Amino acid sequence: MIELLLKEGYIDILNIDIKPPRENKHSQYWRQCDILDLGALKKEIQAFNPELVVHLAAKTGLTRARLDCYAENMVGVRNMFEALKLAPAVQRAIFTSSLLVCQMGYIPKHDTDYKPSTFYGESKMIGEKIVREQKDLNFSWTIIRPISIWGPWGEEPYINLFRSIKQGWYFHIGGGHYRRSLGYVENAVFSIYKLLRAPLEKVSGKTFYIADYEPADLYDMANEIGAQLKARRIFHLPLMPIKVLAAIGDFLRGRGWENVPLQSFRLKNILTEYVFDMSPLKEVVGPQPFTLKEGIARTIKWLKLNQQL
C-alpha cells in the first residue's frame, strides 16, 4: 500500500503496526503501536491527524480456540474509531474485514447476511457490526472483504504453492477444476486506493469484496505457475486417500498438533468453489492493472529476487 501511495505522490504517510515493515525503505513511515493500546493509538492518530485511513490490522489464523484470542479484530476496531474521532482532518476510513464472515462456499445475500463458521470469522463479523453501529461521525466509512490475496510479500498458503510446484511435489487433489475468486496483491492495493479516491456517494457506508474480477481455475493457475517455472507436469491425486490423510490430520490435531499440514477443515477449503460477483467493485474501480499471468510472473520475479524460490 505504501509503495503505491509513494508512486501516486503522497509523502505524508503514517504506518501504525506492532511490527516493523518488511521493506526497509518504508521504515521512515512506521510507528510502533498496538491497536489494543487505546492511549497510544489516540496519541499517534491525534499527532498525525490523517485525512484518509486504511485499517488493515488484524489477528489472523483459524486455529485459536477462543473468540477473545481475536481481540484485535473487535476491540481494535472500536479503538480505531475512538482515536479517529479525535482527528478532525479525517475524511474517509476503510475497514478491512474478511470473506470468512461467512463459511467457505456460502455466498451472502446481502452485506449483513453473516454465517461464520470459525472464531476468526465471528470476530470479523463483530468488527463489521462495530463499524456499522457508529453514529454522528465526521467521516465516511467503507468495509472491504479481501478474498485470498496472493503475490509478492505474501506468506502461506500461496507462497508455498509456488515453492511446491518448483520443487515438483505439488499434486492437484481430485479430478475437478475448482474455480475461485482470488486477488493478486497489486490489484488489491490498486482497488483499495481507488476506493479511497472514488466519489463519496459510491463508497460511503458500503461493503466491497476485493479480488480480481475474473475467477481463477486453480488447476489452470497451477499449470501456469509450473510453465513459467519450467517445472514438471502437475498430476492429480485421487480424492479418497487424501480424505484418509485428512482424517489422520484431524486425529493428530485432537492430540495437540495445531499446525497439521492437512486436516478435514483445510481439505474442505481446498475443494470448495467460491465465485463472487465483482461487478460492484469493478463499477467503482475500473480496469485492474494486472492479469493472472502477469501476477504469476511478477510473483516469481519477486520470489527469486528475495531468494525465496
Question: What does each of the following model-derived ranges do?
Answer:
Residues 102-103, 139-160:
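Flexible, glycine-rich beta-alpha linker
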Residues 154-160, 174-197, 205-206:
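Substrate-positioning beta->alpha
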Residues 117-145:
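Active-site Tyr-X1-5-Lys
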Residues 198-261, 293-300, 309:
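Mid/C-terminal beta-alpha module of Rossmann-like enzyme folds, strongest
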Residues 79-119, 142:
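Conserved Rossmann-fold NAD(P)-dependent oxidoreductase catalytic core, especially the SDR/UDP-sugar
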Residues 1-52, 127:
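N-terminal Rossmann/SDR dinucleotide-binding element
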Residues 35-72, 86, 104-108:
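NAD(P)H-binding glycine-rich loop region in Rossmannoid oxidoreductase-like domains
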Residues 185, 223, 245-288:
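Conserved C-terminal active-site "lid" loop/helix of NAD(P)H-dependent oxidoreductases
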